[in-house]
Protein backbone atom coordinates (compact mmCIF):
# COMPACT_ATOMS: atom_id res chain seq x y z
CA UNK A 1 0.00 0.00 0.00
CA UNK A 2 1.11 3.57 -0.67
CA UNK A 3 0.18 6.87 0.97
CA UNK A 4 -0.21 9.59 -1.66
CA UNK A 5 0.96 13.20 -1.52
CA UNK A 6 -1.24 14.72 -4.21
CA UNK A 7 -0.33 18.01 -5.85
CA UNK A 8 0.11 19.99 -2.61
CA UNK A 9 0.61 23.75 -2.90
CA UNK A 10 0.63 26.16 0.02
CA UNK A 11 0.94 29.85 0.90
CA UNK A 12 0.96 31.06 4.53
CA UNK A 13 -0.97 34.18 3.52
CA UNK A 14 -3.14 34.85 0.50
CA UNK A 15 -0.71 37.46 -0.83
CA UNK A 16 2.45 35.67 0.35
CA UNK A 17 4.97 33.58 -1.61
CA UNK A 18 4.23 30.01 -2.68
CA UNK A 19 6.00 27.83 -0.10
CA UNK A 20 5.06 24.51 -1.71
CA UNK A 21 4.37 24.12 -5.44
CA UNK A 22 2.48 21.09 -6.79
CA UNK A 23 4.29 18.61 -4.52
CA UNK A 24 3.47 15.00 -5.40
CA UNK A 25 5.07 11.70 -4.38
CA UNK A 26 4.18 8.37 -2.76
CA UNK A 27 5.18 6.99 0.64
CA UNK A 28 5.36 3.21 0.61
CA UNK A 29 3.99 1.40 3.65
CA UNK A 30 6.66 -0.38 5.67
CA UNK A 31 9.50 1.70 4.23
CA UNK A 32 11.62 4.62 5.44
CA UNK A 33 11.30 7.76 3.31
CA UNK A 34 13.70 10.69 3.74
CA UNK A 35 12.59 14.18 2.70
CA UNK A 36 15.63 16.41 2.13
CA UNK A 37 16.27 19.95 0.98
CA UNK A 38 17.99 23.18 2.08
CA UNK A 39 16.78 25.35 4.96
CA UNK A 40 13.59 27.17 4.02
CA UNK A 41 12.67 24.84 1.14
CA UNK A 42 9.30 23.85 2.66
CA UNK A 43 10.10 20.57 4.43
CA UNK A 44 8.65 21.54 7.82
CA UNK A 45 5.58 23.08 6.15
CA UNK A 46 4.95 19.69 4.56
CA UNK A 47 5.18 18.07 8.01
CA UNK A 48 2.52 20.47 9.32
CA UNK A 49 0.24 19.46 6.46
CA UNK A 50 0.84 15.73 7.06
CA UNK A 51 -0.08 16.18 10.75
CA UNK A 52 -3.03 18.48 9.89
CA UNK A 53 -1.61 21.35 11.94
CA UNK A 54 -2.20 23.00 8.58
CA UNK A 55 -5.11 23.73 8.09
CA UNK A 56 -6.70 22.76 11.44
CA UNK A 57 -4.51 24.94 13.70
CA UNK A 58 -2.94 27.25 11.12
CA UNK A 59 -5.90 28.08 8.95
CA UNK A 60 -5.18 31.48 7.45
CA UNK A 61 -3.14 30.23 4.48
CA UNK A 62 -4.08 28.82 1.10
CA UNK A 63 -3.80 25.02 0.80
CA UNK A 64 -4.38 23.06 -2.37
CA UNK A 65 -3.96 19.31 -2.89
CA UNK A 66 -4.07 16.58 -0.25
CA UNK A 67 -2.24 13.92 1.75
CA UNK A 68 -4.30 10.81 1.06
CA UNK A 69 -4.33 8.11 3.73
CA UNK A 70 -7.04 5.55 4.58
CA UNK A 71 -9.62 6.68 7.12
CA UNK A 72 -8.49 5.93 10.66
CA UNK A 73 -4.76 6.11 9.81
CA UNK A 74 -2.93 7.44 12.87
CA UNK A 75 -0.13 9.91 12.04
CA UNK A 76 2.28 11.07 14.78
CA UNK A 77 5.05 13.65 14.54
CA UNK A 78 8.33 14.04 16.42
CA UNK A 79 8.77 17.81 16.43
CA UNK A 80 11.88 19.66 15.31
CA UNK A 81 12.03 21.30 18.74
CA UNK A 82 11.23 18.90 21.62
CA UNK A 83 10.38 21.81 23.92
CA UNK A 84 7.26 22.40 21.81
CA UNK A 85 6.10 18.84 22.42
CA UNK A 86 6.90 17.95 26.03
CA UNK A 87 4.09 18.52 28.52
CA UNK A 88 4.16 17.87 32.26
CA UNK A 89 6.68 18.26 35.05
CA UNK A 90 8.40 14.89 34.84
CA UNK A 91 9.53 12.39 32.22
CA UNK A 92 6.70 9.99 33.03
CA UNK A 93 4.16 12.82 32.67
CA UNK A 94 5.55 13.74 29.25
CA UNK A 95 5.34 10.19 27.94
CA UNK A 96 1.85 9.60 29.35
CA UNK A 97 0.40 12.89 28.08
CA UNK A 98 -0.68 11.74 24.63
CA UNK A 99 -1.92 8.37 25.86
CA UNK A 100 -4.07 10.01 28.53
CA UNK A 101 -5.53 12.40 25.98
CA UNK A 102 -6.89 9.56 23.86
CA UNK A 103 -8.47 7.98 26.94
CA UNK A 104 -6.23 4.92 27.13
CA UNK A 105 -6.73 2.70 30.22
CA UNK A 106 -4.14 3.24 32.96
CA UNK A 107 -2.83 -0.33 32.80
CA UNK A 108 -2.05 0.01 29.08
CA UNK A 109 -0.43 3.41 29.64
CA UNK A 110 1.92 1.85 32.20
CA UNK A 111 2.69 -1.04 29.84
CA UNK A 112 3.51 1.26 26.93
CA UNK A 113 5.57 3.56 29.14
CA UNK A 114 7.71 0.66 30.33
CA UNK A 115 8.14 -0.47 26.71
CA UNK A 116 9.46 2.88 25.41
CA UNK A 117 11.59 3.58 28.50
CA UNK A 118 13.30 0.22 27.92
CA UNK A 119 13.46 0.68 24.14
CA UNK A 120 15.23 4.05 24.38
CA UNK A 121 17.20 3.16 27.52
CA UNK A 122 15.55 5.94 29.52
CA UNK A 123 14.65 4.12 32.73
CA UNK A 124 17.31 6.11 34.59
CA UNK A 125 15.49 9.34 33.69
CA UNK A 126 11.92 8.37 34.53
CA UNK A 127 11.77 10.29 37.83
CA UNK A 128 13.68 13.33 36.56
CA UNK A 129 12.17 16.74 35.88
CA UNK A 130 11.97 17.55 32.17
CA UNK A 131 13.32 21.05 32.88
CA UNK A 132 16.59 19.64 34.22
CA UNK A 133 17.28 17.32 31.29
CA UNK A 134 19.90 18.00 28.63
CA UNK A 135 18.78 18.89 25.11
CA UNK A 136 19.52 15.37 23.88
CA UNK A 137 17.70 13.76 26.79
CA UNK A 138 14.63 15.90 26.06
CA UNK A 139 14.76 14.84 22.44
CA UNK A 140 14.90 11.17 23.51
CA UNK A 141 11.88 11.65 25.79
CA UNK A 142 10.03 13.34 22.93
CA UNK A 143 10.73 10.35 20.66
CA UNK A 144 9.60 8.00 23.44
CA UNK A 145 6.32 9.89 23.90
CA UNK A 146 5.52 9.53 20.19
CA UNK A 147 6.58 5.88 19.90
CA UNK A 148 4.29 5.12 22.86
CA UNK A 149 1.36 6.17 20.66
CA UNK A 150 2.21 3.39 18.15
CA UNK A 151 1.31 5.44 15.05
CA UNK A 152 0.66 3.95 11.61
CA UNK A 153 2.87 6.65 10.08
CA UNK A 154 5.73 8.06 12.14
CA UNK A 155 6.95 11.45 10.90
CA UNK A 156 10.22 12.71 12.39
CA UNK A 157 11.28 16.33 11.78
CA UNK A 158 15.05 16.50 12.46
CA UNK A 159 14.54 14.01 15.30
CA UNK A 160 18.14 13.43 16.39
CA UNK A 161 19.73 16.88 16.01
CA UNK A 162 20.54 17.07 19.74
CA UNK A 163 21.43 13.41 20.27
CA UNK A 164 24.96 12.11 20.76
CA UNK A 165 26.29 9.57 18.21
CA UNK A 166 25.26 6.67 20.42
CA UNK A 167 21.71 8.05 20.69
CA UNK A 168 21.53 8.52 16.92
CA UNK A 169 22.64 4.93 16.38
CA UNK A 170 20.00 3.73 18.83
CA UNK A 171 17.23 5.62 17.01
CA UNK A 172 18.51 4.27 13.70
CA UNK A 173 18.34 0.71 15.09
CA UNK A 174 14.83 1.27 16.47
CA UNK A 175 13.57 2.62 13.14
CA UNK A 176 15.19 -0.34 11.39
CA UNK A 177 13.30 -2.71 13.70
CA UNK A 178 10.05 -0.82 13.09
CA UNK A 179 10.61 -1.12 9.35
CA UNK A 180 11.09 -4.88 9.70
CA UNK A 181 7.75 -4.96 11.54
CA UNK A 182 6.02 -3.16 8.66
CA UNK A 183 5.88 0.33 10.17
CA UNK A 184 6.09 3.41 7.95
CA UNK A 185 8.52 6.21 8.78
CA UNK A 186 9.08 9.59 7.14
CA UNK A 187 12.32 11.34 8.18
CA UNK A 188 12.44 15.07 7.39
CA UNK A 189 16.11 15.90 7.81
CA UNK A 190 18.84 17.29 5.59
CA UNK A 191 21.37 15.32 7.61
CA UNK A 192 21.55 11.78 6.20
CA UNK A 193 24.62 10.83 8.23
CA UNK A 194 22.67 8.95 10.90
CA UNK A 195 19.90 7.50 8.71
CA UNK A 196 21.78 6.38 5.58
CA UNK A 197 21.71 2.73 6.62
CA UNK A 198 17.91 2.51 6.94
CA UNK A 199 16.52 4.90 4.32
CA UNK A 200 14.84 3.24 1.33
CA UNK A 201 13.42 6.22 -0.54
CA UNK A 202 14.54 9.86 -0.89
CA UNK A 203 12.42 12.86 -1.89
CA UNK A 204 14.36 16.05 -2.63
CA UNK A 205 12.67 19.45 -2.37
CA UNK A 206 14.11 22.72 -3.67
CA UNK A 207 12.25 26.04 -3.57
CA UNK A 208 9.02 24.23 -2.70
CA UNK A 209 9.17 21.78 -5.62
CA UNK A 210 10.06 18.08 -5.85
CA UNK A 211 13.36 17.76 -7.74
CA UNK A 212 14.16 14.13 -6.86
CA UNK A 213 12.03 11.07 -6.12
CA UNK A 214 13.95 7.80 -6.08
CA UNK A 215 15.99 5.26 -4.14
CA UNK A 216 18.72 6.04 -1.62
CA UNK A 217 21.46 4.58 -3.82
CA UNK A 218 20.29 6.61 -6.82
CA UNK A 219 20.43 9.73 -4.68
CA UNK A 220 23.89 8.96 -3.29
CA UNK A 221 25.22 8.72 -6.84
CA UNK A 222 23.71 12.04 -7.94
CA UNK A 223 26.52 14.35 -6.86
CA UNK A 224 25.16 17.45 -8.59
CA UNK A 225 21.80 17.21 -6.85
CA UNK A 226 23.41 16.59 -3.45
CA UNK A 227 25.27 19.87 -3.89
CA UNK A 228 22.13 21.77 -4.91
CA UNK A 229 20.16 20.49 -1.92
CA UNK A 230 22.91 21.10 0.65
CA UNK A 231 22.50 17.60 2.04
CA UNK A 232 24.82 16.52 4.85
CA UNK A 233 26.17 13.11 3.88
CA UNK A 234 27.98 10.37 5.79
CA UNK A 235 31.69 11.10 5.68
CA UNK A 236 32.11 7.75 3.94
CA UNK A 237 30.01 9.10 1.04
CA UNK A 238 32.09 12.29 1.00
CA UNK A 239 35.20 10.09 0.72
CA UNK A 240 33.59 8.13 -2.12
CA UNK A 241 32.68 11.32 -4.00
CA UNK A 242 36.17 12.77 -3.66
CA UNK A 243 37.83 9.46 -4.58
CA UNK A 244 35.53 8.92 -7.57
CA UNK A 245 36.73 12.23 -9.03
CA UNK A 246 40.27 10.78 -9.14
CA UNK A 247 39.56 7.05 -9.46
CA UNK A 248 36.38 6.57 -11.56
CA UNK A 249 36.37 2.76 -11.21
CA UNK A 250 35.83 2.90 -7.43
CA UNK A 251 32.68 1.11 -6.25
CA UNK A 252 29.96 3.01 -4.38
CA UNK A 253 30.20 2.85 -0.56
CA UNK A 254 28.31 4.64 2.21
CA UNK A 255 29.36 2.93 5.45
CA UNK A 256 32.60 1.95 7.18
CA UNK A 257 32.53 -1.75 6.26
CA UNK A 258 32.09 -0.94 2.57
CA UNK A 259 34.71 1.82 2.69
CA UNK A 260 37.20 -0.43 4.44
CA UNK A 261 36.71 -3.20 1.88
CA UNK A 262 36.95 -0.89 -1.13
CA UNK A 263 39.97 1.06 0.10
CA UNK A 264 42.01 -1.82 1.53
CA UNK A 265 43.45 -2.82 -1.84
CA UNK A 266 44.08 0.73 -2.98
CA UNK A 267 46.51 1.79 -0.27
CA UNK A 268 49.85 0.57 0.97
CA UNK A 269 50.31 0.46 4.70
CA UNK A 270 53.16 2.62 5.93
CA UNK A 271 54.83 2.94 9.26
CA UNK A 272 53.28 5.79 11.12
CA UNK A 273 55.81 7.61 13.22
CA UNK A 274 54.61 7.80 16.79
CA UNK A 275 54.69 11.45 17.64
CA UNK A 276 55.43 12.44 21.15
CA UNK A 277 52.85 14.97 22.17
CA UNK A 278 54.74 18.16 22.76
CA UNK A 279 53.42 19.85 25.84
CA UNK A 280 52.16 23.14 24.47
CA UNK A 281 52.33 25.98 26.94
CA UNK A 282 49.57 28.55 26.83
CA UNK A 283 47.94 31.21 28.92
CA UNK A 284 44.40 30.07 29.71
CA UNK A 285 41.74 32.68 29.04
CA UNK A 286 39.38 30.69 31.29
CA UNK A 287 40.29 28.43 34.18
CA UNK A 288 37.79 26.24 36.04
CA UNK A 289 38.69 24.86 39.48
CA UNK A 290 36.90 22.07 41.36
CA UNK A 291 33.54 22.92 39.78
CA UNK A 292 30.51 21.19 41.33
CA UNK A 293 26.86 21.69 40.35
CA UNK A 294 23.94 20.06 42.14
CA UNK A 295 20.42 20.78 40.86
CA UNK A 296 17.27 21.31 42.90
CA UNK A 297 16.10 17.73 42.25
CA UNK A 298 19.33 16.42 43.79
CA UNK A 299 21.01 15.47 40.51
CA UNK A 300 24.74 16.26 40.46
CA UNK A 301 25.57 17.64 37.02
CA UNK A 302 29.27 18.41 37.54
CA UNK A 303 31.71 16.67 39.88
CA UNK A 304 34.95 18.45 40.78
CA UNK A 305 35.71 19.55 37.21
CA UNK A 306 39.07 21.20 36.58
CA UNK A 307 39.80 22.54 33.09
CA UNK A 308 41.43 25.40 31.27
CA UNK A 309 40.70 27.05 27.93
CA UNK A 310 43.62 28.20 25.74
CA UNK A 311 43.25 31.70 24.35
CA UNK A 312 42.62 32.15 20.62
CA UNK A 313 41.82 28.49 20.02
CA UNK A 314 38.78 26.48 18.97
CA UNK A 315 37.87 24.28 21.92
CA UNK A 316 35.38 21.40 21.67
CA UNK A 317 33.44 20.14 24.69
CA UNK A 318 32.52 16.50 23.98
CA UNK A 319 30.54 13.81 25.76
CA UNK A 320 27.31 11.86 25.69
CA UNK A 321 23.90 13.42 26.28
CA UNK A 322 23.61 14.27 29.96
CA UNK A 323 27.38 14.28 30.53
CA UNK A 324 27.33 17.90 31.75
CA UNK A 325 28.46 19.81 28.64
CA UNK A 326 25.76 22.50 28.61
CA UNK A 327 25.85 22.71 32.40
CA UNK A 328 29.60 23.32 32.13
CA UNK A 329 29.40 26.14 29.55
CA UNK A 330 26.52 27.85 31.37
CA UNK A 331 28.91 28.31 34.30
CA UNK A 332 31.38 30.08 32.01
CA UNK A 333 29.03 32.98 31.28
CA UNK A 334 27.34 33.10 34.68
CA UNK A 335 23.94 31.63 33.77
CA UNK A 336 24.60 28.93 36.36
CA UNK A 337 26.25 29.56 39.71
CA UNK A 338 28.28 26.60 40.99
CA UNK A 339 27.42 24.70 44.13
CA UNK A 340 31.14 24.98 44.81
CA UNK A 341 34.28 25.72 42.85
CA UNK A 342 35.66 28.63 40.89
CA UNK A 343 35.55 30.06 37.36
CA UNK A 344 38.23 32.60 36.41
CA UNK A 345 38.45 34.80 33.30
CA UNK A 346 41.96 36.15 32.71
CA UNK A 347 42.86 35.35 36.31
CA UNK A 348 39.83 37.05 37.87
CA UNK A 349 36.81 35.28 39.35
CA UNK A 350 33.50 35.84 37.54
CA UNK A 351 31.32 34.46 40.33
CA UNK A 352 30.38 37.84 41.78
CA UNK A 353 29.42 39.31 38.43
CA UNK A 354 26.09 39.44 36.61
CA UNK A 355 25.45 37.69 33.29
CA UNK A 356 25.30 41.12 31.62
CA UNK A 357 28.74 42.01 32.98
CA UNK A 358 30.26 38.66 32.00
CA UNK A 359 28.74 38.72 28.49
CA UNK A 360 30.90 41.71 27.58
CA UNK A 361 33.76 39.19 27.57
CA UNK A 362 32.13 35.74 27.39
CA UNK A 363 28.90 35.29 25.44
CA UNK A 364 26.75 32.18 24.93
CA UNK A 365 24.68 31.19 21.89
CA UNK A 366 21.96 28.83 23.09
CA UNK A 367 21.24 25.39 21.70
CA UNK A 368 17.66 26.33 20.80
CA UNK A 369 17.37 29.66 18.93
CA UNK A 370 13.87 30.33 20.30
CA UNK A 371 15.55 31.07 23.64
CA UNK A 372 17.36 34.05 22.11
CA UNK A 373 15.04 35.47 19.46
CA UNK A 374 12.59 38.09 20.72
CA UNK A 375 13.07 41.19 18.58
CA UNK A 376 10.56 42.26 15.91
CA UNK A 377 12.90 42.09 12.91
CA UNK A 378 15.99 40.21 11.78
CA UNK A 379 17.94 43.50 11.69
CA UNK A 380 17.09 44.35 15.31
CA UNK A 381 18.00 40.82 16.39
CA UNK A 382 21.34 41.04 14.63
CA UNK A 383 22.25 44.26 16.46
CA UNK A 384 20.74 43.43 19.86
CA UNK A 385 23.98 42.46 21.64
CA UNK A 386 25.87 45.45 20.27
CA UNK A 387 23.11 47.85 21.32
CA UNK A 388 22.93 46.38 24.83
CA UNK A 389 26.71 46.61 25.23
CA UNK A 390 27.10 50.05 23.67
CA UNK A 391 29.24 48.74 20.80
CA UNK A 392 29.32 50.96 17.71
CA UNK A 393 28.23 49.52 14.36
CA UNK A 394 27.29 50.93 10.97
CA UNK A 395 24.61 50.23 8.40
CA UNK A 396 27.41 48.83 6.25
CA UNK A 397 28.24 46.30 9.01
CA UNK A 398 24.63 45.12 9.04
CA UNK A 399 24.35 44.89 5.25
CA UNK A 400 27.66 43.04 4.94
CA UNK A 401 26.70 40.40 7.52
CA UNK A 402 23.16 39.87 6.22
CA UNK A 403 24.36 39.61 2.62
CA UNK A 404 27.23 37.28 3.39
CA UNK A 405 24.98 34.88 5.28
CA UNK A 406 22.07 35.07 2.80
CA UNK A 407 19.63 36.91 5.07
CA UNK A 408 19.50 40.21 3.17
CA UNK A 409 15.94 39.54 1.99
CA UNK A 410 14.84 38.78 5.57
CA UNK A 411 16.05 42.09 7.07
CA UNK A 412 12.58 43.39 8.04
CA UNK A 413 11.01 39.97 8.66
CA UNK A 414 10.04 38.44 12.01
CA UNK A 415 12.94 36.20 13.18
CA UNK A 416 10.75 33.33 14.39
CA UNK A 417 9.36 32.96 10.87
CA UNK A 418 12.77 31.87 9.57
CA UNK A 419 13.63 28.21 9.06
CA UNK A 420 15.30 26.42 11.98
CA UNK A 421 18.73 26.60 10.36
CA UNK A 422 18.33 30.30 9.56
CA UNK A 423 17.15 31.04 13.11
CA UNK A 424 20.20 29.31 14.51
CA UNK A 425 22.53 31.17 12.16
CA UNK A 426 20.91 34.48 13.16
CA UNK A 427 21.55 33.82 16.87
CA UNK A 428 25.22 33.17 16.08
CA UNK A 429 25.46 36.27 13.89
CA UNK A 430 23.98 38.39 16.68
CA UNK A 431 27.12 37.93 18.81
CA UNK A 432 29.51 38.96 16.03
CA UNK A 433 28.92 42.65 16.77
CA UNK A 434 29.34 42.17 20.53
CA UNK A 435 32.43 43.06 22.53
CA UNK A 436 33.03 39.46 23.71
CA UNK A 437 36.35 37.77 22.96
CA UNK A 438 35.14 34.32 24.08
CA UNK A 439 32.15 32.88 22.21
CA UNK A 440 30.32 29.80 23.49
CA UNK A 441 28.37 27.82 20.86
CA UNK A 442 26.01 25.12 22.12
CA UNK A 443 25.22 22.70 19.26
CA UNK A 444 25.80 25.38 16.60
CA UNK A 445 24.91 23.13 13.62
CA UNK A 446 21.44 22.25 14.93
CA UNK A 447 18.90 22.58 12.10
CA UNK A 448 21.50 23.69 9.55
CA UNK A 449 21.88 22.36 6.02
CA UNK A 450 25.24 21.81 4.34
CA UNK A 451 25.36 25.38 3.00
CA UNK A 452 24.89 26.94 6.44
CA UNK A 453 27.40 24.56 8.04
CA UNK A 454 29.95 25.54 5.39
CA UNK A 455 29.33 29.22 6.20
CA UNK A 456 29.61 28.45 9.92
CA UNK A 457 32.96 26.69 9.50
CA UNK A 458 34.42 29.67 7.63
CA UNK A 459 33.05 32.04 10.28
CA UNK A 460 34.57 30.09 13.17
CA UNK A 461 37.98 29.95 11.48
CA UNK A 462 37.86 33.70 10.77
CA UNK A 463 36.94 34.44 14.38
CA UNK A 464 39.93 32.37 15.50
CA UNK A 465 42.17 34.27 13.07
CA UNK A 466 40.88 37.51 14.61
CA UNK A 467 42.04 36.30 18.04
CA UNK A 468 38.68 35.17 19.42
CA UNK A 469 38.36 32.03 21.53
CA UNK A 470 35.58 29.68 20.42
CA UNK A 471 34.18 27.04 22.78
CA UNK A 472 31.67 24.74 21.13
CA UNK A 473 29.55 21.79 22.12
CA UNK A 474 28.75 19.50 19.22
CA UNK A 475 27.78 15.89 18.56
CA UNK A 476 28.80 16.24 14.90
CA UNK A 477 32.15 14.52 15.36
CA UNK A 478 33.61 15.02 11.82
CA UNK A 479 32.75 18.74 12.10
CA UNK A 480 34.51 18.92 15.47
CA UNK A 481 37.67 17.19 14.28
CA UNK A 482 37.93 19.45 11.23
CA UNK A 483 37.88 22.59 13.36
CA UNK A 484 38.94 21.97 16.95
CA UNK A 485 42.43 22.61 18.30
CA UNK A 486 41.71 21.48 21.85
CA UNK A 487 39.15 19.20 23.50
CA UNK A 488 37.61 18.70 26.92
CA UNK A 489 35.62 15.48 27.38
CA UNK A 490 33.02 15.01 30.10
CA UNK A 491 31.41 11.75 31.21
CA UNK A 492 28.66 11.63 33.85
CA UNK A 493 29.69 15.07 35.09
CA UNK A 494 33.40 14.26 35.38
CA UNK A 495 36.26 15.40 33.16
CA UNK A 496 37.91 12.35 31.58
CA UNK A 497 40.20 14.05 29.05
CA UNK A 498 41.72 17.42 28.23
CA UNK A 499 44.19 18.07 25.44
CA UNK A 500 44.70 18.55 21.71
CA UNK A 501 42.84 16.49 19.11
CA UNK A 502 46.20 15.02 18.05
CA UNK A 503 46.60 13.71 21.60
CA UNK A 504 43.01 12.52 21.67
CA UNK A 505 43.28 10.27 18.59
CA UNK A 506 45.96 8.28 20.39
CA UNK A 507 43.54 7.62 23.28
CA UNK A 508 41.00 5.17 21.88
CA UNK A 509 40.21 4.17 25.46
CA UNK A 510 38.67 7.61 26.04
CA UNK A 511 36.28 7.37 23.09
CA UNK A 512 35.46 3.79 24.09
CA UNK A 513 34.60 5.05 27.56
CA UNK A 514 32.13 7.64 26.27
CA UNK A 515 30.86 5.23 23.58
CA UNK A 516 31.60 7.56 20.67
CA UNK A 517 33.54 6.65 17.53
CA UNK A 518 36.26 8.67 15.84
CA UNK A 519 35.34 10.19 12.45
CA UNK A 520 35.64 7.80 9.47
CA UNK A 521 38.74 9.61 8.12
CA UNK A 522 40.52 9.12 11.45
CA UNK A 523 39.48 5.47 11.76
CA UNK A 524 40.45 4.71 8.16
CA UNK A 525 43.78 6.55 8.60
CA UNK A 526 44.57 4.12 11.39
CA UNK A 527 43.11 0.96 9.88
CA UNK A 528 44.69 1.46 6.44
CA UNK A 529 48.07 2.19 7.98
CA UNK A 530 48.53 5.70 6.64
CA UNK A 531 51.73 7.40 7.75
CA UNK A 532 49.73 10.25 9.25
CA UNK A 533 46.30 10.58 10.86
CA UNK A 534 44.23 13.12 8.95
CA UNK A 535 41.10 15.00 9.97
CA UNK A 536 39.34 15.99 6.76
CA UNK A 537 38.34 14.30 3.50
CA UNK A 538 40.64 16.27 1.17
CA UNK A 539 43.74 15.38 3.19
CA UNK A 540 42.60 11.75 3.37
CA UNK A 541 42.14 11.50 -0.42
CA UNK A 542 45.56 13.07 -0.97
CA UNK A 543 47.09 10.39 1.27
CA UNK A 544 45.36 7.36 -0.27
CA UNK A 545 46.01 8.45 -3.87
CA UNK A 546 49.62 9.55 -3.50
CA UNK A 547 51.97 7.44 -5.55
What are these regions, as identified by a protein language model?
Residues 207-208, 492-493:
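Conserved ABC ATPase "signature" C-loop
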Residues 129-133, 137, 414-418:
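Conserved ABC ATPase signature
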Residues 107-125, 393-410:
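Conserved ABC ATPase "signature" region
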Residues 51, 333:
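Helix-to-loop junction immediately C-terminal to a conserved catalytic motif
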Residues 59-73, 341-349, 358:
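Conserved ABC transporter NBD signature motif
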Residues 36-38, 318-320:
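The feature captures the beta-strand-to-loop junction immediately N-terminal to the Walker
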Residues 154-157, 439-442:
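Catalytic Walker B motif of ABC-type/P-loop ATPase nucleotide-binding domains
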Amino acid sequence: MEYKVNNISYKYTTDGPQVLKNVSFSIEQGKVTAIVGPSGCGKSTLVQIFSQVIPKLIGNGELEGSFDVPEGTFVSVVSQNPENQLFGYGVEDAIAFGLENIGMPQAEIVERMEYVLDLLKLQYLRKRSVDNLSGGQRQSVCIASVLAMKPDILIMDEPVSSLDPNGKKMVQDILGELRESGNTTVIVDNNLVWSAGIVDHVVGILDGEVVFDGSRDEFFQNFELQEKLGVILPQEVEIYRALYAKVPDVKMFYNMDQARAELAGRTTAKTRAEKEAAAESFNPVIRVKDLVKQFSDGFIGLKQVNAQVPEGKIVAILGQNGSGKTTFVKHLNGLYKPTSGEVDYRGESILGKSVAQISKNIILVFQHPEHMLFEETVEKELTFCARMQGVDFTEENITEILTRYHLENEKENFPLNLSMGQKHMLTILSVLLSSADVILLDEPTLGMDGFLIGDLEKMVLELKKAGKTIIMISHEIPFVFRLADYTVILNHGEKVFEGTKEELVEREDIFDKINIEFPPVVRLSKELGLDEIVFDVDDFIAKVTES
